[in-house]
Amino acid sequence: MAVVTMKQLLDSGTHFGHQTRRWNPKMKRFIFTDRNGIYIIDLQQTLTFIDKAYEFVKETVARGGLVLFVGTKKQAQESVAAEATRVGMPYVNQRWLGGMLTNFSTVHKRLQRLKELEAMEQTGGFEGRTKKEILGLTREKNKLERSLGGIRDMAKVPSAIWVVDTNKEHIAVGEARKLGVPVIAILDTNCDPDEVDYPIPGNDDAIRSAELLTTVIASAVAEGLQVRAGLRCGDGKPETEAVEPLPEWEQELLAGAGSSALNDSGADLSEANPTEA
């Protein structure tokens, strides 16, 4: 069964690129034609690259890998958060802080601080403090939640990242490449394919296109989680290859994530002055 259909891609506007005057010549091989000054992306290639990306993500997760979903533009924020949450993966949909990957030790400390503040708030740790102190702690917690809430359970550098709009997320892409973390991304006609390991030629500006392709990647994660749990679709035989033990929170996700399917229709990480992509 196809991961996604041509009709779904057409209905979501995945084939629409940018104006012909706004393009990257390296994308020429992915362009089918131009119409009324707009490049039309070759969806046959899109389907082929979707299959490659899907298999890579599934295999990565099956072997215990983690996929970080990144999309901070308005068109992608909702779907990135929803789909990553559906399959228990970390995400960044508000802003990318410079050093989030390359300086992960600092990120981890800030995540610990966030959890500490949340625990204080829930267990009465704010009691006995002045209103000014409580206000300061609350603001600190809210700021950390906005910046790092989507990766609160990310204990290590991800095995791969999914990116909506590599131009906007150039800092994230640069950090991933520096660390050798594979990049899976939508490639619009103004993007540089050399920056991406698993490209999916498509429209990264349309909400429906970003949502559809993000859902595809999340579904690949869900299937990878099933394999990791020792399931093999169709024959019910256990997976013989050794994989990392499945955490309890991922076991809880399996029933919901596995049954979901596509519908046919650089700065530091201190609290001050975060870098926004």
From Swiss-Prot:
Disulfide bonding pattern of the chain: none
Domain of life: Bacteria
GO cellular component, one term: cytosolic small ribosomal subunit
Presence of keyword Nucleus: no
CDD domains, per database record: RPS2
Molecular functions per Gene Ontology: structural constituent of ribosome
Keywords recorded for this protein, A-Z: Ribonucleoprotein, Ribosomal protein
Protein's recorded name: Small ribosomal subunit protein uS2
Organism: Mycobacterium leprae (strain TN)
